């Protein structure tokens, strides 16, 4: 049985966010590199650094948090995995869903790599819906 790297990334970030951790360490692959690049460009993470440790590459992600001592902690990352190994969900460019009226993003795996819903609509291509982020 293969690993679901997208689910590992989502769970690591979600668990760190809920546990009020500021830094997350994930293994580096081509898919995770593209996924992290999208999260950084869209402003969901503050910093991403790639480093090597014992012949393996890792990403160290710094999450954005809204912490205030007077108010309770607010989760800013809501991630939901859509397509999974047992049930792949595909969409063409016209039927890519809008998340919160365009505030959130959909990350797709297309024939031209991993991209956001906005990029896919502009290029007119569809693909596999990986996750929703809002």
UniProtKB/Swiss-Prot annotation:
One of its GO terms (molecular function) is structural constituent of ribosome. The keyword Disulfide bond does not apply. GO terms for cellular component: plastid; ribonucleoprotein complex; ribosome. Its main location: plastid. It comes from the Eukaryota. It holds the Pfam family Ribosomal_S8. One of the primary rRNA binding proteins, it binds directly to 16S rRNA central domain where it helps coordinate assembly of the platform of the 30S subunit. Part of the 30S ribosomal subunit. This is Small ribosomal subunit protein uS8c.
């Amino acid at each position: 049985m293969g690993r679901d790297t997208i689910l590992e990334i989502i769970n690591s970030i979600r668990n760190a966010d809920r546990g009020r951790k500021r830094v997350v360490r994930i293994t580096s692959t081509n898919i995770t590199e593209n996924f992290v690049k999208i999260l950084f460009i869209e402003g969901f993470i503050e910093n991403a650094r790639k480093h090597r440790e014992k012949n393996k590459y890792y990403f160290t992600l710094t999450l954005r948090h809204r912490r205030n001592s007077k108010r309770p902690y607010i989760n800013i990352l809501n991630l939901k995995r859509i397509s999974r190994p047992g049930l792949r969900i595909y969409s063409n460019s016209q039927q890519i869903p809008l998340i919160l009226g365009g505030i959130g993003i959909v990350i797709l795996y297309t024939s031209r790599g991993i991209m956001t819903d906005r990029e896919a609509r502009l290029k007119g291509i569809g693909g596999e819906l990986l996750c929703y982020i809002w």
